[in-house]
């Protein structure tokens, strides 16, 4: 019983420290604006093909945005998704 509890605590701490792998930064304040092509920028978590399609963070000094490749369990392959993350984070 003790090893099982230790493993569960370790897993919980790992998730808290490293974050969820599908966390795209949707909760981080971002600017939703129209792009030169007339479309709206894509919010974090949306599919993308280029960095300039993604919405920019309201605080660009501390946060970075872009189009990054992530594993999609739903599609069973890697897909490009818009992300916003804290610059000082090792996951950015």
UniProtKB/Swiss-Prot annotation:
It comes from the Eukaryota. Glycans are attached at residue 62. Residues 1-19 form the signal peptide. The presence of a 'disulfide through disulfide knot' structurally defines this protein as a knottin. It is found in: Secreted. It comes from Trittame loki (Brush-footed trapdoor spider). GO terms for molecular function: ion channel regulator activity; toxin activity. The keyword Magnesium does not apply. Belongs to the neurotoxin 21 family. This is Toxin ICK-19. It holds the Pfam family Cys_Knot_tox. GO terms for cellular component: extracellular region. Keywords: Disulfide bond, Glycoprotein, Ion channel impairing toxin, Knottin, Neurotoxin, Secreted, Signal, Toxin. Expressed by the venom gland. Disulfide bonds join 41-55, 48-67, 54-82, 85-92. Probable neurotoxin with ion channel impairing activity.
């Amino acid at each position: 019983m003790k090893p099982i509890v230790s493993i569960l605590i370790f897993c919980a701490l790992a998730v808290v420290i490293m974050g969820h792998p599908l966390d795209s930064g949707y909760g981080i304040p971002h600017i939703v604006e129209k792009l030169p092509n007339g479309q709206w920028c894509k919010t974090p978590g949306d599919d993308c093909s280029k960095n300039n399609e993604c919405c920019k963070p309201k605080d660009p000094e501390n946060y970075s945005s872009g189009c990054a490749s992530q594993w999609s369990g739903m599609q069973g392959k890697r897909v490009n998704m818009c992300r916003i993350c804290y610059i000082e984070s090792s996951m950015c």
